[in-house]
Amino acid sequence: MAQPPPQLPPGWVAQWDPNAARQVFVETATGRTSWQPPTAGPAGVAPPQQHQQRPTHPQGQARMSMPQIQPPPGMRGPSLSPISQHGPGAPVSPPSAGSPAPASIGPGASRRRAYPTAHLAANSISYAGGYDASTATGAGVAYPGAQDAQPQLFTPGAPDLTPSPYGAAAQPALGAPGLAPAPGAHGAPGVGPAPGYAAGGVQGITNQFQAMGVGGGVAGGMGQKFSTLQTVNISGVQPNVNDLERPPPEIRLPPNACVSTNPKANADPSYQRCTLNAVPTTSSLLQKSKIPLGLILSPYRSVREADGDEPVPVVTDTVIARCRRCRTYINPYVTFIENGNRWKCCMCNISNEVPQLFDWNSETNQPADRWQRPELNHSVVEFIAPREYMVRPPQPPVYTFLIDVSYQAVNSGMVATAARTILETLDRLPNSDNRAKICIIGVDTSLHFFSITPEGTEPDMLVVSDLDDVFLPKPNDLLVNLTECRAGVEALLQRLGDMYKDSLVTGSALGAALQAAYKLISPIGGKIMVLTASLPSVGPGALKNREDPKLLGTAKESTLLGAASSFYKTFPIDCSRSQVSVDMFLFAPSYTDVATLSCLPRYTGGQTFFYPAFHAGRAEDAVKFSHEFSEVLASPISYEAVLRLRATKGIRATAFHGNFFVRSTDLLALPSVPLDQNYAIECEIEETINAPFVVFQSVVLHSTSSGERRIRVINLALPTTSSMSEVYANADQIAIATLLADKAVERSIHSRLEDARDALFNKLVDVFSTYKSTMTSAGSGASPQLAIAQNLAQLPLLVLALLKHVGIRQSSSIPSDLRAYAQALLTTLPAQQLIPYLHASFYCLHNMAPEAGTTVAEKGFVMPAKLNLTSERFERHGLYLIEDGQNIFLWVGREAVPQLCLDVFDVANYGTLRGGKTTLPKLDNSMNQRVNAIVQRIRDSRRGPYRPHLYIVKEDGEPSLRLWALSLLIEDRFEQSPSYMQFIGQLRDKVNGGS
């Protein structure tokens, strides 16, 4: 049986060497290393030899030599720049006993030795964990001492002084959106104040290493050290929009918190993140900070090779170790005891037996290395579940399409576009084992079933007009195996677009169609995909047009955002019990009651898509819907799922947000789990936490389309603290804003929109007031400044963006359908997509840098510099791009030169340019190619099925389109909403008034 990690002598830490795939032991006081665990001895005492050589690779190949050195203050261990006389990768042996000492450098150098670095150029082991890739490639060294460091995105070295043919001089370019900034990436040292020179002696060197974040990764180090609190004044200061792309505060766990030194042993923020990366030990401290404690999770984040994503490791031997008391799954934060025969749970501290086959490789029938098991090295892992995790065998993927065939739907081209998209996507449906089943039902004031048999190629239409007691004609031929009946399915889809071209029926019996689909697939479960362009008007679930312009912008507007019929609340609960999910694709020539119909996906784990004023005659509409519909159809299915959160004793989940049904106090039922769907869980501290760190474990038990029952486990470990300053220094403003968006939507539906807006502003006032009274010298007195921790400096900007968002904004001109759909997005978009949806990206295109819009070797695709969201950036001759992930606007100034119009839009001048929804032409000139590349990059860079529309907005063009684009410039005053500077002034006055 594998042995647990040895207890290290004082002054030694274990680090992970990814090249050797094993641990290396580092003496932090001297820098010497060893492959073998050090023996106990006086801390910090070096062996008799002058220099210690780096241990030999386990396979006998010499890795590199490493003289005993003292790194300069502020550097991350030995990850330093190479000296010129040694090429990258050249190992340097330690100097011989009689060799001269290195030359001194700088004033006072005679009292300090120089820092040899050449031997660290190629394969330097970073004291933050593993090999430092940036150093190996000759990049600059990241260090935690740059006080006001900005994200290190690409910027051309020399500004182009050649005037742009379209206006002012070129701007510098920044890295593409969606790419993580280099400094402070997850698991790397964060940005903090520059540490001073440490005191002399071994203790001084130790302090240097602590300041550099040594051991501050997953496994801890010499001592637990939290992110440094940096207070900034945001009053009168323009927000730095690039801060929104910075990673959350670094998670710094105490030493020996983790059984593995693998840097992936803690959850990536894209899977699971917490509003606080240092959890208060008491409820009183949490409440005093006014920061909500919550988790933001996206358990099925899409894996994209283009982004460097790695697939989730899978444990295939069905050996699953769980705590016998709290049922926690074994993870990197448990403790092995009794010579590795038992493990102590990190949640409830009870000891459990290690399974007999835990150290056995079932494929080779040989003993296995315990420390290589995925569940002990990775924060996100999947287990193939044995039979005891199955109520029934995993069912096949089932797709039931309810397609509106009324006059409105046929006339808009929706029916033909949907049929063509399904036909083209049949080969991409999850059907690897040929078990997928499909059913198509047409809906107007009657139900149109299609009987398909394996032998025939011509489907039979069966019409049912009795809506009060729906029955299924030929039920065995309605839901058919896709592989066996492929010819009949294709024949139906090819004819469907023309079958109803002469129909004049205008009603919709959607409720009866839903009941029929449920009756058909409830024994199996599966997906009901509704495509409708009509308001349900007859039969069960019939709705009336309740849009009342007089209610918009009033206290009664919230009545338009809840379900209008109880049918749409009770029916999805029945679906959830039978593992049936509903996806809604809504096409709106007029009022569709999105608020009511979106209840179906909300309680069944589905998705809502909305296409206002859809008409397939516009190529842009057809392409957007076809792309999004096919992406949803082709995405891997995780169905028959339940989600549960477990946390360290003393922490309890109190509220849940997202698309699911709460089956019990802590169990969420999800008939399907879409890719890139977001969920939020609020937590509270019930009792004092005595542990040095806490663990949150999210578990999703689900079935795959290939017939496997799997368990996805996501672990997040966070240190605890009793210090208010450490609570603020470790707050994650992105996670906080995501949770506040969920709470605001819920408040607006169950109370009033005004209450939701007030709650957002009051939460901001509470946080700033508490920070001012506890963390600043101003205390309770009035102050002209507005102080907050640097990592929370953009929280007011995000709250203002939420207050100005179409889902929450005070306005009498926002149709309830648009507001309801925006709220559906606010509660389901993962944080990486939600923040751009709240705070749009703004670029100047007419004078962007020469490299912007192109792919540069070793730099990737280069985007223009991001601008603050204010119309002050507009120039009358300019071309600008504003995008929020759902729509892209090209703003064209009224004095745009003819050459710009010709190069980009292929029109002679501004006067002949038409505004509105469009597709850019592809021309043979650099400017057009770069703008097209930027638009395509924006569409491709974010996860999820969405394809944003592109609009041309002329400065003096259509007023409604112009106001729509301007509403995204949240730093400006808009309608009743204040500008950013006015908002900060109101916040400062409120904070001073309440002090």
From Swiss-Prot:
Chain segments annotated as transmembrane: none
Location relative to the cell: Cytoplasm; Cytoplasmic vesicle, COPII-coated vesicle membrane; Endoplasmic reticulum membrane; Golgi apparatus membrane
Key words of the record: Cytoplasm, Cytoplasmic vesicle, Endoplasmic reticulum, ER-Golgi transport, Golgi apparatus, Membrane, Metal-binding, Protein transport, Transport, Zinc
BP GO terms, sorted: COPII-coated vesicle cargo loading; intracellular protein transport
Keyword Flavoprotein (UniProt): no
Domain WW stretches: 6-40
Name of the protein in its database record: Protein transport protein SEC24
Organism: Mycosarcoma maydis (Corn smut fungus)
